[in-house]
Amino acid sequence: MRLLKKIWVLVILFGAFSAVAQDVQYSQFYASPLYLNPALAGTSDQHRVVGNFRDQWPAIPGSYISYSISYDVNISEAHSGLGFTVQRDQAGSGALSTTTVGGVYAYEIKLNRKLAFRPAIGLAYGNRAVDMTRLKFGDQLLTGNDISVQSNLINDRVGYMDISAGGILYGNEFWFGYSIYHINRPNNSLLGDENYIDARHNIHTGYRLP
């Protein structure tokens, strides 16, 4: 009963924090390990290549399509893990797209014979772009109007650096991880104003049953 009360307290505390949705979410969390937590880089004994594809509302024209690929490897002699990620998100028939390329590094620290901690950091470069030739506006369809597109865009693309970090505490039977993405809250506005990406927090845990 006391354990159940503690669990409810944790749920309430986590629920007290506001969440802002701006990143793509894959339904199979552990099938995209580096997107869940950079500290998962190198947790496999072998070379690992992961691919993900997500098509939201495929029956509707101009659906949201996201795909990513990652590679990570364990460097046992250095107690480290390295990983690389590429992700692309397309919205509105590909008119608006975001591409991110990055790398992560994780290091394993043995706390004692049963516990270990893996801190990690990630650095990525993002590019957000809009293709105005894929967009059509009502005034373009009027007879006699110029078909050229007029917009308030300062640039048709913008680049930014993105920083992430995370950590995993684990033993033989359990693990607990936390990660934060967009630590530096990069500005990805195409209008020349301020449009900062909010930080994304992930908490994940598990227990291995005998």
Give residue spans per PLM region.
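Bacterial Sec-dependent N-terminal signal peptides
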Residues: 1-25, 31
